[in-house]
Amino acid sequence: MNHLTIVTYHYVRPIKGSKFPGIRGLELEGFRRQLDYLDKNYTIIGTEQVIDASRNGSKLPAKACWLTFDDGYADHSKFVLPELLKRNLHGAFFPPKVAIEDTVVLEANLVHHILSCVDDVKQLVFKLNSCCRSSGIADSEIGSHYNEYAVPNRFDNAETVYVKRMLQHVLPPELRLSISRDFFDEFVGVSVADFSDELYMSVDEVRDLVKSGMYVGSHGSRHYPLDKISSGEQQKDIQQSLNFLEHVGAPTKDWVMCYPYGAYNDVTLSLVKKHGASLGITIDFGVANFEADNLFALPRLDTNDFPQ
């Protein structure tokens, strides 16, 4: 069987001594230990081998493992790249265009850092619901949202999941961005522009990943859940992300799509195939099976699923 263990990473940094010790990420020392573990127990392969398996059906080595890094964080150039190069390992990086080229902070990152700076998430839920109420949302609708979305998962408690869902997907875009920015100002207390410059890689740093032999693929342009936007908007977003890849010197033939939030629909799959993608990766839980899975919707495991 052609199985592939795809590992997902986001924040990788010395967290305890950082400005945001409450952020949910992987400590640098834990990353080093995890690389040692994976290198010993798996065969870490490069993206070219993954693409060859998807395009040509070539066999993957036993216990093949592929390291993937989402969202374009400065952590990836500052901390991850040196560790990979030191071990002669390969990684695949998926930065969204706007995070690298524009002075913005992705909605998800606003929410992550708000949560990292809040002592009591239940109080944050209370404030969020008050903001919704002030915006004209009825108590019955708020209660319905809470009942539907306040469900714990393997990473977060119920209240945290509720805040993430409401501020990343459920509320209307303008309202959720307004609330997130107000909460960011209140709890994080730094300017969005300065925060963006510090959080994400620069264009030159992404180019350095490519020059260092790493793979850079698409994570969309605006980091939107693609299944929530029209086919025309999806087309535009995917094309802009490919233009960005070309701009940083990354391949745009047989490229890899990493869906923002793991979200896609049939239109998305059709578009990425039309634009020449070789495969797509999601946030669905599991080890990828190249003989049975949809190659444009492969599952991944999380760094938290392995020793650190």
Pin down the residues of each PLM region.
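Metal-dependent polysaccharide deacetylase catalytic core of the NodB/CE4 family, i.e.
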Residues: V7, R13, A64, L85-A263, ...
